[in-house]
From Swiss-Prot:
Enzyme type, top EC level: hydrolase
Alphabetical list of CDD domains matching this protein: DSP
Localization terms from the record: Virion; Host cytoplasm
GO-annotated biological processes: symbiont-mediated suppression of host innate immune response; symbiont-mediated suppression of host JAK-STAT cascade via inhibition of STAT1 activity; symbiont-mediated suppression of host type I interferon-mediated signaling pathway
Protein name, as recorded: Probable dual specificity protein phosphatase OPG106
Complex formation: Homodimer.
InterPro entries on file: Dual-sp_phosphatase_cat-dom (IPR000340), Dual_spec_Phospatases (IPR052103), Prot-tyrosine_phosphatase-like (IPR029021), Tyr_Pase_AS (IPR016130), Tyr_Pase_cat (IPR003595), Tyr_Pase_dom (IPR000387), TYR_PHOSPHATASE_DUAL_dom (IPR020422)
Similarity comment: Belongs to the protein-tyrosine phosphatase family. Non-receptor class dual specificity subfamily.
Primary role: Serine/tyrosine phosphatase which down-regulates cellular antiviral response by dephosphorylating activated host STAT1 and blocking interferon (IFN)-stimulated innate immune responses. Dephosphorylates the OPG144 protein.
Gene for this chain: OPG106
Amino acid sequence: MDKKSLYKYLLLRSTGDIHRAKSPTMMTRVTNNVYLGNYKNAMEAPSSEVKFKYILNLTMDKYSFTNSNINIIHVPMVDDTSTDISIYFDDITAFLSKCDQRNEPVLVHCAAGVNRSGAMILAYLMSKNKESSPMLYFLYVYHSMRDLRGAFVENPSFKRQIIEKYVIDKN
């Protein structure tokens, strides 16, 4: 087995169903200005203590708020194993980086706050990684977020795409 195949196998195996995932209900602060949540968190965003500048909506459903200064960016994604989410990695990670740098709070969400939004958050955190071991950093971030949220990027195809871009291609 070559090095890339070994890394991919180990990463996918170690992020399997270690404990039964449960749907997160609370919004999670990921960095100073980037938050991860679900649809309900997004609907409550206008009255949140956090004064969001943006909401990144990754569901298939488009919505808007009345009497709110929150800018909603809709990037429709399907949560299934055939969706190519890697086409969004560069644009979304760049956007989240700008929000962090400019101190503009952003909520990233999908329906449950697990797969689509979790994958974009994981891609963002991996894109910021300056560590010499992307494999270990991936495992650290994945398990830390899963411990915090109860479920995090459970879609194996989404994990695979992140591993290919941010771990395998870095080695």
